[in-house]
Amino acid sequence: MMKLYQKIVLGVCIMSSIAFGSVLPKYESKILENGLQVVVIPLHNKSNVIETNVFYKVGSRNEVMGKSGIAHMLEHMNFKTTKNLKAGEFDEIVKQMGGVNNASTSFDYTRYFIKSSTQNLNKSLELFAELMQNLEFIDSEFQSERDVVAQERLWRTDNTPSGYLYFRFFNTAYVYHPYHWTPIGFMTDIQNWSLQDVKGFHETYYQPQNAILLVSGDVNPHDVFSGAEKYFSKIKNKGEIPKVIMQEPIQDGIREAYIKKDTGGIEWLIMGFKTPSFTHKDQVALEAIGDVLGGGKSAILPSILQDKLQLASSVSAYNMDMIDSGMFIIIATGNAGVSANALKEEILKQIEKLKKTQITQAQLDKIKINTRASFIYSLESASSVAGLFGSYFVRGDIQPLLDYEKNLESLNTKQIQDVAKKYLVLDQATTLIMRR
């Protein structure tokens, strides 16, 4: 791995992300000798606010059956005792400097951030470098935090109808790939992790060569690169990063499951269709289809199922783009006395209609206007800019983001129809119904 980095010409590589007419801010990027990629996105807004992020290229996608949820557990452990910090001291230091911090674990990556004033840049870098190299893994802290995670699993998944339905959906939709479980993991795995399991996961994946340091906001790139060199350049890598080799087999038929759960007499439906990687050219059209079907009260499914037929109390549709095969998801909650099968029948009817009849140009224009507005809004704060850019850098390809506006502008009604025909295929659908 290091031989590869030695071939890279070191130094600042200024990457302009502004194509003609683009509203994306510019970014600058540098790769340190140990492989850590440092990205700076100055916003020039004189806000004196920055967000310092460390993205690790590891999520539940990198776990194995029997050890699910470890990436999320490590996120919890990462704020415990280190060589130079007591448990809780990280949070206290951030609080004392007037900042806020948090973390999240997804299917594809883990994100840590500190939002602070610009003058606290170096302290934020120092804190994150400490977590990367000096976490101590004390058994008593591990045991108590495991209990916290188990309670989170109960609260967000087992005892919440929507959370449980979502978890069981992925259990059904993916049979081989680690997307088979959501980042919280299975309860039996949570109960049976060892401290060494979590420590080994940290040693394997929390390495400079597997991380992105990203700072956005009112900041000078030179200060970030200088600070990154000071605090991170001497952290050594410990070994090769294992590649995810599992690929979900092509789905060769309908998958359906029925779940018994106390839902208060209300029936729930979730339906999904496999989609390609986040890098695929069809992603913009899939996002638009999500807006057409479920993006707001005037979208097709809410207007038909909720307003006209009064079958559902809520219905949504959206596209999940991931490193490997993603998912286009539709979720509906029935009104009292309405069966999930009735919801399913009407949803499939509307999908087939979309595939047979192109949406109007006026509908597409409205989607483009709303999407552009949301996109511009996402570039207003250091936090949202970091989240947007970081989600592409950490998954290994920034180009889909750089091309996004151009691809949205060129999107036409026939493309939407063709992409709907290509992916919203009934005999490749996964459907779960939950009822008492």
Task: Cite the ranges covered by each PLM segment.
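Positively charged n-region of N-terminal signal peptides that target proteins for export
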Residues: M1-K7
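Charge-rich, well-structured scaffold segments of protease-associated domains
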Residues: I31, D91-E240, S277, K308-L309, ...
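Short, surface-exposed beta-strand/loop micro-motifs that present aromatic residues
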Residues: E28-S29, Q37-L43, K199-T204, G253-K261, ...
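Bacterial N-terminal signal peptides
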Residues: V9-S17
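Boundary at the C-terminal end of the N-terminal hydrophobic targeting segment
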Residues: A19-G21
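His/Glu-based metal-binding/catalytic segments typifying zinc-dependent metallopeptidases
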Residues: N171, E240-I300
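M16/MPP (pitrilysin/insulinase) zinc-metallopeptidase core fold and M16-derived inactive scaffolds
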Residues: E51-I114, W181-P183, G295-L311
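Mature N-terminal segment immediately following signal peptide/propeptide cleavage
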Residues: V23-N53
